Regions:
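Bacterial Sec-dependent N-terminal signal peptides
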Residues: 1-24
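Cell-envelope and extracellular/periplasmic
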Residues: 23-486
Length: 486
């Protein structure tokens, strides 16, 4: 073989292994065939090319031009577009032309977190036994054929640009098997109400703490205050700050989204965190919104499920109250504008299973929050009864709730469970609970002068207290120490 042939073969091999060497215009992985573009927002289209190369983007009657800068980076912005189920092609041209096919315009959401968000549709389809929530009439893994729901699964090691422009898929068949069940059912519920294309992006890692999802520099912010004492910096206990942010969130920026869904916390609860988690959570919400240049971007999350942390084999000691304290920390995020939370204390068959199976109901409940708060369907009730205030009257406590919907109720028709009260001795005992309108009257013959209340204040919480829409009441304690300082 002569030298010339060796050179040709070497170049051919390089171009086959690294197609970007031959393609002057390169797109990020998130831009590809089958994608959904966010409606009614400016849509950035970006990538790299040779410095100074002229780039043209044509889509939906729009024609945009720009030039790659000295670093080879370029970006154009498409004008806001109405939703469209009409599949269209986008042409990106420099010295080469890339044609992205089958593109829709609609609503796009990013869902993230740990294993309960990552929990795949293939696991969901194997569920047997007692049904909780509004179970689908069929196995979506076998029957899903709605071409207007698209999915993109962020894989940790496969977000580099490539020449296939794959990644986005119609939510059906093989592509749907590995996708987040919560994300899919959320998107399905949105489509059934909005009747426009839905794009769901899933970026989740089993067992992950919250720190890897936050840009490392953001966790180096000023220490927070707790009862007048300085907390250590939020990154003091390590937790691999920024690890998954760098590989699974940053590559998505600035792909336009409507909002975020978050289902995470078990790994931080194992650390017995409470207020520290609340500050980390706030940092994550604010930093992601800042990344997408929208300080009011919707952020909806799941209050994690009951689980027996105190009976687990973890090396740290836990009490049955560690989880309620974590729930309390999660709920503090509701003080941040444009956030929403769902409670799932009723979706657990066993507190030794950290992965409760009813993901279709988790997705549905998250969709209720979005439909009410983002899409302004104000007739949709999106939360269970939520503590508002209490008044002490003689030897009873009168508790007022918000999110009562069409009225307060008991899931099984029996007296309400889960309430405890205490007097000055702080010894909590089970309380008798009587519903009156949007209030609950609590009392106990063992507490003559009640002062404080707790509801579902245990890791095994499973109260029958709901509103008429079937949504469970949110755990709380009336003496929450954090609400005045967070």
């Amino acid at each position: 073989m002569n030298f010339k042939k060796i050179i040709i073969l070497t170049l051919a091999t390089l171009l086959s292994v690294y197609p970007e060497l031959s393609a002057k215009v390169i797109l990020p992985k998130i831009l590809g065939h089958n994608m959904v573009l966010q409606r009614l927002k400016t849509v950035p289209i970006w990538g790299t090319a040779n410095p100074g190369e002229k780039i043209t983007v044509v889509f939906g009657g729009q024609h945009k031009e720009t030039m790659a800068n000295d670093s080879g980076k370029w970006e154009v912005k498409l004008n806001p577009m109405a939703a469209s189920e009409l599949p269209r092609e986008m042409a990106i041209t420099g010295t080469n032309t890339i044609r992205l096919k089958n593109i829709l315009v609609g609503e796009v959401w990013l869902c993230s977190g740990q294993s309960n968000m990552e929990y795949a549709m293939r696991k969901n389809s194997k569920i047997q036994g007692t049904v909780k929530g509004k179970k689908p009439l069929e196995d979506d893994l076998l029957t899903s054929n709605n071409t207007n729901i698209r999915i993109f699964l962020v894989r940790r090691k496969y977000m580099s640009p490539d020449s296939t422009h794959g990644g986005w898929d119609v939510a059906s068949g093989v592509a749907l098997k590995d996708f987040s069940a919560v994300g899919y059912f959320y998107g399905k519920e949105l489509y059934q109400k909005l009747h426009i294309p839905i794009g769901m992006i899933s970026s989740a890692v089993p067992g992950s703490r919250i720190e890897p999802w936050i840009e490392a520099i953001k966790l180096e912010a000023s220490p927070k205050m707790k009862d007048g004492k300085v907390l250590n910096p939020l990154n003091a206990d390590n937790g691999d700050p920024g690890k998954f942010y760098a590989t699974m969130i940053k590559p998505l920026i600035p792909f336009p989204l409507r909002g975020f869904l978050w289902y995470q916390g078990e790994s931080n609860c194992f650390l017995n965190e409470n207020i520290r988690y609340a500050y980390k959570f706030k940092t994550l919400i604010e930093s992601w919104r800042n990344d997408w240049k929208n300080e009011t971007m919707p952020f909806y999350f799941v209050q994690i499920a009951p689980y027996g942390y105190s009976i687990s084999k973890d090396v740290r000691p836990h009490t049955p109250e560690n989880l309620p304290e974590f729930w309390e920390a999660q709920a503090l995020a509701l003080t941040i504008p444009n956030t929403g939370m769902i409670t799932i204390t009723d979706l657990v068959d066993s507190i030794v299973d950290i992965h409760p199976a009813y993901k279709w109901e988790v997705g549905r409940r998250l969709s209720l929050v979005a439909l009410n708060k983002t899409y302004k369907f104000k007739d949709i009730i999106c939360s269970g009864p939520t503590y508002k205030q209490m008044k002490i009257k003689n030897n009873r406590i009168e508790v007022t709730f918000t999110n009562t919907g069409s009225g307060l109720g008991s899931r099984n028709g029996k007296p309400l469970t889960g309430f405890t009260i205490a007097g000055v001795d702080e010894r909590f005992v089970e309380a008798q609970a009587e519903m009156r309108g949007n209030k609950v009257i609590l009392s106990s013959p063992d507490v003559k002068e009640p002062l404080t209340i707790r509801f579902s204040w245990t890791e095994s919480a499973g109260s029958n207290f709901i509103n008429a829409e079937g949504l469970p009441a949110v755990p709380f304690r009336s003496d929450n120490p954090w609400v005045k300082i967070f």
